[in-house]
Amino acid sequence: MNQKLLIWILQTGEPLPSDDGLHRPMRAINLANALTSAGHNVVLWSASFNHQMKVHRCNGYKSIQYSENLEIRLIPSPGYKKNIGLGRLFDHMILAKNLKKLLKQEKVEPNAAFIGYPPIESASIMTHWLKKRNIPCLLDIKDQWPSFMVDALPRGFQSIGRAILSPYFYLAKRAMKETTGLSAMADDFLKWALDFSNRERTNNDLTVPLTTENCQISDDERKSAIQWWEKQGV
């Protein structure tokens, strides 16, 4: 019988299984479903603030026992109104600060972890905590932050921008160096992370495209779909 593992997932900007309404499964839900289906226990760390809806899921910290094998932990943060702006930076700073407080109280360590990047701050906090305890983790690169912010500036201002964002560069490189492996949705993202952190590629670094679950359709549904496309001239 395979060993039953405890896996942590840290993904703060994606829909959660506990969210109301329909939502497209992304990294967090897909991985959690795969792990729990295999009989493992999963703790999914996320934010109390819903990035897509721009509303809070709860006030303060909350733990949700979503199923027998899946616990969802919501980390408090102030939230923000716009995807780009100081409000989001402040939210991520507070999110990381609160995550650090919660980790200090943690008594049960995971066997392994999967960490979404960005946010840089919380990813750096989590990888550092895991590294100190020799717990393997995979850092999932979803964005080329903070490099793309500097690259978007006129050439004459890029050195100034890099200096202003230097704390983010430090935390990002630390997270990428302290993780056991890197993953990304595309080869270009993985190459950027390896180059950014001066990290030699190993067998632990891999590209994992975002996919959706296979869905079963009936013969009637298939026939109806074919007829619809034929009407469109396809």
Residues of each region from the PLM?
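N-terminal subdomain of nucleotide-sugar transferases
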Residues: 1-65, 181-183, 213
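Nucleotide donor/acceptor-binding cores
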Residues: 3-5, 111, 234
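Acceptor-binding helix/loop patch of EC 2.4 sugar-transfer enzymes
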Residues: 12, 77-87, 133-170, 213-215, ...
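An aromatic- and histidine-rich active-site surface loop
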Residues: 18, 88-98, 112-133, 139-148
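Helix C-cap/helix->beta junction micro-motif
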Residues: 38, 129-135, 178
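A conserved catalytic-core segment of Leloir-type glycosyltransferases
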Residues: 44-105, 208
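Structural motif
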Residues: 111-112, 181
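Donor nucleotide-sugar binding/catalytic pocket of nucleotide-sugar-dependent glycosyltransferases
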Residues: 136, 146, 161-234
